[in-house]
Amino acid sequence: EKPGVYLDENNRRMFSNYRSTFGELALSLLAAGDTAKALEVTYKGLGLVPEDKMPYDYFALSLADALIECGRKDEGKEIINRILKYSGDYLGYCVAVPATERFGLEYTIGLNMQTYIDIYRMSRRLGLDDIATPLEQELNRFYSLLYPSNR
C-alpha cells in the first residue's frame, strides 16, 4: 500500500495468486446466486492488489469476468482491455526478438498467449464481440509470428 515499495518476484507471484483466488471466489459466489457478496469480494481483490502496484494480467481475468457477470460490464471490459494491452505489449516485444534469442521467454510467451485465448473464449461466452472479433485476428497474428513451424 505504500507508494514506491518494490515488489520482488516472490511477492508479485503471491499477489497474483490473491487476484486469482478472489476472482475464483467471486465466480463461485455468483454460481451460488450471491451477486452482492461476489461484487464485494471482487472489489476487495482489486483493492488488495491495485493496478499501480502490479499491472493487470492473466491472474486478474477472473476478477474482470466477475465484474461483468455482476452487471458491471464497463468496469470488467476496462480491466480486460488493460490486460490485453499488457499482454499485447509483451508479445509485441517477444516477436521483435529474433527467435534464436528468445531463450527464457517461453513461459511468459505461453502465459500471455493463454491470456489472449482465455479472453477470447470469455468474450465469446459473454457476447463481447467488440473484444472477441479483433482479438481473434491479433491472436492469429501472434501465433503465426511466434510459432511459424506449427502452421
Task: Give the positions of each predicted feature.
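C-terminal luminal/periplasmic domains and tails of membrane-associated envelope-modifying transferases
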Residues: 1-151
